[in-house]
Design a protein with these regions (language model features):
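Long, contiguous binding/interaction regions
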Residues: 1-199
Length: 199
């Protein structure tokens, strides 16, 4: 049984009208079940088949589903759940195939907390630490860190953990200590080009 990776994909189209067209096109690929499967109409394989971007759906990784798609301004937003890692090939190559005369910018961030896997091609997230406070029972630590999931810069996180542990240890040592003593996952967003996930 895989761990599930949640990926937020943002497609910059340049115009609101084109964003609406792209969003509608992606949605239309999910209305028809191109291949029998256990995921339903929103299976990534249906997108691969119905977009006509692939001779066979097996030519692309598609173990997952498109959970949501919407246009907002000049951008199209997609939420994808997939096994272990991002699987964006069906959508990205499908859109490029459907709109060959257009050039799009693709930005994504993906998280699979079970394996502390966080990757992105967004420069503003790279190097930020993702703090997952789910399950922290230590009230004093929760008070310092705050409740919820969020991204934090190195300086802030170092200050909070050094204050909590009354220590001047390095951030890496403190993160290991928090994981061991509190079961908290703190890891940083790594840069990974989108090409790594559209094969």
């Amino acid at each position: 049984m895989p761990n599930w990776c949640s990926t937020s994909l943002e497609i910059e189209t340049g115009t609101e009208m084109l964003a609406k067209k792209v969003s509608d096109k992606i949605e239309s690929w999910c209305h028809e079940c191109g291949v029998e499967n256990g995921f339903g109409d929103s299976w990534l394989g249906n997108i691969a088949v119905n977009s006509n971007a692939f001779p066979m759906y097996s030519d692309v990784s598609c173990r997952g589903t498109l959970e949501d798609v919407w246009a907002e301004g000049t951008k199209v937003h997609c939420i994808v759940y997939s096994a272990w890692e991002p699987q964006l090939g069906a959508i990205v190559r499908g859109v490029n195939h459907a709109f060959p005369e257009k050039t799009f910018e693709y930005h994504y961030d993906a998280e699979e907390p079970g394996c502390c896997f966080y990757c992105t091609n967004r420069s503003e997230l790279v190097g930020q630490y993702h703090v997952d406070t789910c399950g922290i029972e230590n009230e004093a630590l929760l008070e310092q860190i705050g409740d919820g999931q969020y991204d934090a810069d190195r300086k802030w996180l170092t200050g909070i953990l050094q204050k909590f542990y009354r220590s001047h240890e390095s951030l890496e040592i403190l993160i290991d200590r928090v994981a061991e003593e509190e079961g908290v996952c703190i890891t940083f967003w790594e840069y990974e080009p989108i090409d790594s996930y559209i094969e």
